Amino acid sequence: MVKAVCVINGDAKGTVFFEQETSEAPVKVTGEVLGLAKGLHGFHVHEFGDNTNGCMSSGPHFNPRNKEHGAPTDENRHLGDLGNIQAAGDSPTAVSITDSKITLFGADSIIGRTVVVHADADDLGKGGHELSKTTGNAGARIGCGVIGIAKI
């Protein structure tokens, strides 16, 4: 069992927890984010755990296999593509994701990388915009934090 935690700061704030029983098991992602406008917001793991220049230093989506951007259910997607979270607009936004592509184990572990919450909806690579296949055209980075190992 490996557990990790991410404290998100910026215009969006919150805490997100990651838990994986074994290297073969899916990762459970839970938590809540505050400060989001009503609607969908892109939710991704970015390549670097560097927030020295705010969320912009975190680099592109974590993509060690050089795939195009896609939906969490797509075979062809960045490892860091976790889709969208749905905000009601006036209350904390719950995060509840189970993903079988990200991992907390080995060379492709997301520990030490950055979670980024975006201002707009992720079009899941299907929007036809020039950014659809790289970022999901999800807009500005409004909150982020580095994923760290948590006490079990």
Curated annotation (Swiss-Prot):
PROSITE patterns in alphabetical order: SOD_CU_ZN_1, SOD_CU_ZN_2
InterPro entries for this protein: SOD-like_Cu/Zn_dom_sf (IPR036423), SOD_Cu/Zn_/chaperone (IPR024134), SOD_Cu/Zn_BS (IPR018152), SOD_Cu_Zn_dom (IPR001424)
Binding site for Zn(2+): H61, H69, H78, D81
Cofactor binding note of this UniProt entry: Binds 1 copper ion per subunit. Binds 1 zinc ion per subunit.
Cofactors, names only: Cu cation; Zn(2+)
Entry-linked Pfam families: Sod_Cu (PF00080)
EC number: 1.15.1.1
Gene Ontology MF: a single term: copper ion binding
Record-listed Cu cation binding positions: H44, H46, H61, H118
Reactions the enzyme catalyzes: 2 superoxide + 2 H(+) = H2O2 + O2
Oligomer status and interactors: Homodimer.
PANTHER family per the UniProt record, alphabetical: SUPEROXIDE DISMUTASE CU-ZN -RELATED
Family statement drawn from the similarity comment of this UniProt entry: Belongs to the Cu-Zn superoxide dismutase family.
Protein name, UniProt field: Superoxide dismutase [Cu-Zn]
Organism in which the protein naturally occurs: Drosophila pseudoobscura pseudoobscura (Fruit fly)
